[in-house]
Amino acid sequence: MSDTIAAIATAHGVGSISIVRLSGERALEFALKLSHKTKLTPRHATFTKLFNQNNEIIDEAIMIYFKAPYSFTGEDIVEFQIHGGFSVSEVLLEELVSLGARLALAGEFSKRACLNGKMTPLKALNIQDLILSKSALAAKIIARNMQGNLGELLEKIRTDLVKTLAFVETSIDYADDDLPSDLLEQISTMCEENSKILKEIYTLSQSKKGLIEGFKIAIVGKPNVGKSSLLNALLSYERAIVSDIAGTTRDTIEESFKLGTHLLRIIDTAGIRESKDVIEQIGVALSKKSLEDADIILAVFDASRVQDKEDEKIFDLLANTDKKIFWILNKSDLENVFKNTQNKNFIKLSAQKDITLLKEELQNYLNSFDSEGIMVSSLDLINACKISSEAIFRAKGLLEESSLELFAFELNLAINELARFTKDFQRDEILDEMFGNFCLGK
């Protein structure tokens, strides 16, 4: 990390301000050359002109110097606040490169912060999640995680496991000495409690991931029941073609919209029916895949048409799902000839006239998901909690069987999974994978 890196830290495009960030051993040197200053006071905003090596002015800027180790990365950092737009920040960045800086890789500032002990990998993930959060509620959950509650809990569990492992491995070396029975009971209880905590974290995170990612909603029904009309009504604009011709929608259409504070990702699927049309068959297959991925299903039926075998197939398709289903009887403004043989609690509406009742029902359901409890949005961390929980649970059983070597193996597995997020580490390939999806300048 001896080189000095530079990047534009703000989004590209026209705006009032752009920020260019510089980090590394030569950051102060480059800043002094650009500004023609002889010194900079750390943490003080300095208004200055910036010049290129031909002594031509680049822009006027506010320049802030953060002296190591009291900076985001733990290195010397200089931030240039300049005028926004497409060109000025690029010109400044090119000048920094000509002075000897290197263009930063995606997430490299955060990676350096981790390597220099300024933050844990877990906090870095939380920062990235906060940047990408899609709703105010998601931001609230992630900001709460950043306060350290989750990190402290995971580190406490890891520390408990390390202490236990140290004792057990010592006991393996001195196998002739009997372990006190009450100590075995304490270890067993510790394993049970920590396994349960980790299981609660990953199950809660899985069940409420829609709060952070946005709830996926799939609209399903046979052809020509008004699925596309319902999609358009929910979006409040015409996104899908509405036609009396059955099979108009042959592919899945996905859009996002806000309902109250919740982000919804809604998918209009191709009508499900038997068809010899190859393209339509592919659309039906995609529809069934969308149902598997959805958090909520809107099952649409036509009030003006007699229930038939295609309707029955929809009922059969949804019979064993554990997803939340809203049963919708569309076109209820027309003569109602649909017989509710399945005794479903239908919401009666006309997608082309008024869907207020559906929106109210949806919002009431979404509001029932509170944001309390510890939740994580990183799939990698959710999997780590799951793997650790299961390993600790297996270890408890092995302890009861006095299989101490296998007990130690399972505990090691859990410790290593948790340590990836709670402890500093030097494995660059893991860091590269973790920060590869971060923004430039972050």
UniProtKB/Swiss-Prot annotation:
GO terms for cellular component: cytosol
Compartment(s) where it occurs, according to its Swiss-Prot or TrEMBL record: Cytoplasm
Keyword flag Nucleotide-binding: yes
KW Flavoprotein (keyword) present: no
Residues at which (6S)-5-formyl-5,6,7,8-tetrahydrofolate binds: R21, E79, K118, K442
Molecular functions per Gene Ontology: GTP binding; GTPase activity; metal ion binding
Residues in TrmE-type G domain copies: 214-367
Principal EC category: hydrolase
Quaternary state and interactors: Homodimer. Heterotetramer of two MnmE and two MnmG subunits.
Similarity section: Belongs to the TRAFAC class TrmE-Era-EngA-EngB-Septin-like GTPase superfamily. TrmE GTPase family.
Name of this protein: tRNA modification GTPase MnmE
The gene coding this protein: mnmE
